[in-house]
Curated annotation (Swiss-Prot):
It catalyses: IMP + L-aspartate + GTP = N(6)-(1,2-dicarboxyethyl)-AMP + GDP + phosphate + 2 H(+). The gene is purA. Its cofactor is Mg(2+). Homodimer. Mg(2+) binds at D13, G40. Binds 1 Mg(2+) ion per subunit. PROSITE patterns: ADENYLOSUCCIN_SYN_1, ADENYLOSUCCIN_SYN_2. This is Adenylosuccinate synthetase. The lineage of its organism: Bacteria, Bacillati, Cyanobacteriota, Cyanophyceae, Synechococcales. Coiled coil: none annotated. Keywords: Cytoplasm, GTP-binding, Ligase, Magnesium, Metal-binding, Nucleotide-binding, Purine biosynthesis. The keyword Nucleotide-binding applies. SUPFAM superfamilies: P-loop containing nucleoside triphosphate hydrolases. Pathway: Purine metabolism; AMP biosynthesis via de novo pathway; AMP from IMP: step 1/2. It comes from the Bacteria.
Length: 437
């Protein structure tokens, strides 16, 4: 038995969906532990392209239990649409489970999220407008609605009475929006509750039962380390904790249940929305990476900002998450480049630093110090073993591993499952295994 956490080591969109899908073959339970519909992952199975926001990637395996944990915030309308999409594609959803204590994104959360972002003007933070921040805010203020509340009309009415009145007041008086009709909201969300009822479980109890039965458990994070509420580029962050420690809180388990932590990072760097990005590229090279990498958000469709691999934030992700190994994705996107650069340090106000500044203002002033490496100018998409890669591609991977001081366990060379080189099984491999490439 081995229990593994998969996290994003950059600003999200690293390809966690594909890696989780790959690892789900060895997992009995897959747990999504934080985030909401602001995340998105794309899975390619044969000729099918499936885009999911809430439901874990492991749903493609009929024997796997897929659990949406207590640390997530759930938009039931979106979740039900995903269920319908999966059923239409003949995918068995009998293993899908939803934590009774997960908080629910209500219609006023979305309206307030969008209105707040519009009001910020030039100081916008780049929210997806899906209501995630306001949902987590209500949770922290003990004013939220949970999944279990949708299963009981009297409880929902009682729980919703004061929050809805307060939100309507805010919508009308501050944002000049129309108020929501309480009866319509109650009717709509009771229907969602009825449809989701068969999937609702006690999250922590379900996970501990699986652990007692010596099942392999995979904890799937959303977004990425640099978007973490406490450890990211605040305030340009998400409203939850994507780092590995968030798995314990969001799933209701102790840290001793976790055996290994695997990070996922692209062979370059991307970011969606606002916030500092030291290695960001401009012009034709940015366009080339964006087009070859298909860098458009699963959730918003927004074009991602592209840049060179940042080894400073890579090392930071290794430390903050306690990574045992890392998966490098989209190596093939670099196939046509003559020269590839990697950020090895920053210059901040004339001083060389090799750490991630805690202040977003300081981070925005950081200038990257690059190491240039030769490109390989040949396709890697069909390589099946490390030995098949061009020597310069091997050297690039070795450089990243040595820079971050973490072994590379997986190399992804495209969207399909078979475009993957597994160096070391992250679920059953030893902790901090040596890289041998």
């Amino acid at each position: 038995m081995a229990n593994v956490v998969v996290i994003g080591a950059q600003w999200g969109d690293e390809g966690k969906g594909k890696i989780t899908d790959l690892l789900s073959r060895s997992a009995d339970v897959v747990v999504r532990y934080q985030g909401g519909v602001n995340a998105g992952h794309t899975i390619v199975v044969e000729d099918k392209v499936l885009k999911l926001h809430l439901i874990p990637s492991g749903i493609l395996y009929p024997e796997t239990i897929c659990l949406i944990g207590s640390g997530t915030v759930v938009d039931p309308k979106v979740m039900l649409k995903e269920i319908e999409m999966l059923i239409e594609n003949d995918i068995d959803i009998s293993g899908l489970q939803l934590a009774s204590t997960a908080h629910v994104t209500m219609p006023y959360h979305r309206l307030i999220d969008q209105a707040m972002e519009k009001r910020r003007g030039e100081q916008k933070i780049g929210t997806t407008g899906r209501g995630i921040g306001p949902t987590y805010a209500d949770k922290a203020q003990r004013n939220g609605i949970r999944v279990i509340d949708l299963l009981d009309e009297q409880k929902l009415r009682e729980r919703l009475r004061i929050p809805l009145a307060e939100k309507n007041n805010v919508l009308q008086k501050i944002y000049k929006e129309l108020p929501l009709d309480q009866e319509k909201v109650i009717e709509e969300y009771l229907e969602y509750g009825d449809r989701l009822r068969p999937h609702v479980v006690d999250c922590s109890r379900a996970i501990h039962q699986a652990a007692r039965n010596r099942k392999n458990i995979l904890f799937e994070g959303a977004q990425g380390t640099l978007l973490d509420l406490d450890h990211g580029t605040y305030p340009f962050v998400t409203s939850s904790n994507p780092v590995s420690g968030g798995a314990c809180i969001g799933a209701g388990v102790g840290p001793t249940l976790i055996d290994r932590v695997i990070g996922v990072a692209k062979a370059y760097t991307t970011r969606v929305g606002e916030g500092p990005f030291p290695t960001e590229l401009e012009g034709s090279l940015n366009d080339q990476l964006c087009d070859r990498g298909g860098e458009y958000g699963t959730t918003t469709g927004r074009r991602r900002r592209c840049g060179w691999f940042d080894g400073v934030i890579g090392k930071y992700a290794v430390e903050v998450n306690g990574l045992d190994c890392i998966a490098i994705t989209k190596l093939d996107v670099l196939d046509e480049l003559e020269e590839i650069k990697v950020c090895v340090a920053y210059q901040l106000d004339g001083q060389k630093i090799e750490y991630f500044p805690s202040s977003a203002e300081d981070f925005s002033r950081c200038k990257p110090i690059f190491k240039s490496l030769p490109g390989w100018k040949s396709s890697t998409a069909e390589c099946k073993r490390l030995e098949d890669l061009p020597p310069s591609a091997m050297a690039y991977l070795r450089f990243l591993a040595e820079l971050m001081e973490v072994p590379i366990a997986i190399v992804s060379l495209g969207a399909s499952r078979d475009q993957t080189i597994v160096v070391e099984d992250p679920i059953h491999g030893p902790k901090r295994a040596l890289l041998n490439i």
